From Swiss-Prot:
Assembly, per entry: The cytochrome bc1 complex contains 11 subunits: 3 respiratory subunits (MT-CYB, CYC1 and UQCRFS1), 2 core proteins (UQCRC1 and UQCRC2) and 6 low-molecular weight proteins (UQCRH/QCR6, UQCRB/QCR7, UQCRQ/QCR8, UQCR10/QCR9, UQCR11/QCR10 and a cleavage product of UQCRFS1). This cytochrome bc1 complex then forms a dimer.
Manner of cofactor binding, per the entry note: Binds 2 heme b groups non-covalently.
Species assigned in the record: Sorex hosonoi (Azumi shrew)
PANTHER family noted in UniProt: CYTOCHROME B (PTHR19271:SF16)
Name of the protein this chain belongs to: Cytochrome b
A GO biological process held by the record: mitochondrial electron transport, ubiquinol to cytochrome c
Additional remarks: Heme 1 (or BL or b562) is low-potential and absorbs at about 562 nm, and heme 2 (or BH or b566) is high-potential and absorbs at about 566 nm.
Residues that span the membrane, as ranges: 33-53, 77-98, 113-133
């Protein structure tokens, strides 16, 4: 008797996606940080756009625009805190992602590793421009 999950057309799709997944069986939770980085980046971009709609960078009105965001904008305080804490979470996930790469020897793949190092420097430069310089 043949196995139904390997012969039925719809069950074959489910089988190849969930049951016989072509992934190593020893994959751990350390491999989730790439997707967590993507989620943190999307949160940063969206909250940054909403904050930029109400922020004024003029030295005379910058503080009052931040208080306007926190007091007058609907859930502005939440957007501001999500943006601030999302940046911290982004860098925690980023450093854990790099640490996982070091632990599992991903530096042996030179082209991929060098692109990752360039991305790390670009992220750090962007964070410097957005946090330290204003």
């Amino acid at each position: 008797m043949t196995n139904l999950r390997k012969t039925h057309p719809l069950m074959k799709i489910v089988n190849s996606s969930f049951i016989d997944l072509p992934a190593p069986s020893n994959i751990s939770s350390w491999w989730n940080f790439g997707s967590l980085l993507g989620i943190c980046l999307i949160i940063q971009i969206l909250t940054g756009l909403f904050l930029a709609m109400h922020y004024t960078s003029d030295t005379m009105t910058a503080f009052s625009s931040v208080t306007h965001i926190c007091r007058d904008v609907n859930y502005g305080w939440l957007i501001r805190y999500l943006h601030a804490n999302g940046a911290s979470m982004f860098f925690i996930c980023l450093f854990l992602h790099v640490g996982r790469g070091l632990y599992y020897g991903s530096y042996m793949y030179l082209e991929t590793w060098n692109i990752g190092v360039l991305l790390l420097f670009a992220v750090m430069a962007t964070a410097f421009m957005g946090y330290v310089l204003p």
